[in-house]
Amino acid sequence: MTLTPLAVRPSTETEFDPRPSLAVWKFASCDGCQLTLLNCEDELLEVADRVRIAYFPEATRATVAGPYDISLVEGSITTPSDAERIEQVRAASRILVTIGACATAGGIQALRNAASVHEYLTVVYPHPEYIATLGRSTPIAAHVTVDLQLRGCPIDRHQLLEVIAALLRGRRPRIPTASVCTECKRRGTVCVAVAEGMPCLGPVTQAGCGALCPAFHRGCYGCFGPQDTPNTASLASVLGDQGTDRRDVRRLFATFNAGAEAFRSQGLAAPDAQEVAP
């Protein structure tokens, strides 16, 4: 994707306001990644000064019709109406950025992909015929073209600000693609996997959280999803050699990014795990 400075190309519907337009969309999610934008605190006023927040129901009822220069999309696709709506969002967006584990990998709700959704519906709802749902929870990229993605559950606010700043300047955002292990080394955190034998997904998880969990003496649970070259099979073997029960290894990979293929191969779709097709 070729990026040009957004400041020189405002949406036609907002020509009276020279700022690029920003829209924030929610699909199947908890709202945590949207709230990251509101939690920018000191930087939020500067963001609002540089971009026009045209659509953001979490923050305001005021809306401006598209098209939009930037769309931040949170959540996975779980219903037929979601699948239709994301097509409309894509058509109305110059640049579409997925934010968070739900949007980039299907989220925790992707656990449904390893079971029969029909069975769940008949057990939970007295009239399942009224429930419109898809058999799987899928990331946004499975339905439309995605220009950029931000990992995490929730995303890191500094990365979000970097993406917005980069798009305004027409450059690629500087988002790390190394593993969480590099962040442990930078902050001088003792490796909990080597020193304590704790199960840790740090070697295969993308950096971005600042190695928060290891800093508090617990293993990484992979909320930023797999890094560019994750050897999850090797890590699963090492975890087993350290004494971690195979069922616990599967559970470790089957959390926030259970639908990401590299994690799915050792979690929901592991050779000794039974996956029920929807």
Language model regions located:
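Short secondary-structure transition/capping segments
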Residues: 109-111, 163
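Short gly/pro/ser/thr-enriched loop/turn and capping motifs at secondary-structure boundaries
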Residues: 102-107
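Short glycine-/small-residue-rich Rossmann-like dinucleotide-binding loops
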Residues: 75-77, 101
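Catalytic or ion-translocation cores adjacent to nucleophile or general acid/base/metal-coordination motifs
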Residues: 98
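Short, hinge-like loop/turn segments at secondary-structure boundaries
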Residues: 113-117
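Iron-sulfur (Fe-S) cluster-binding modules
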Residues: 1-72, 82-83, 87-95, 118-278
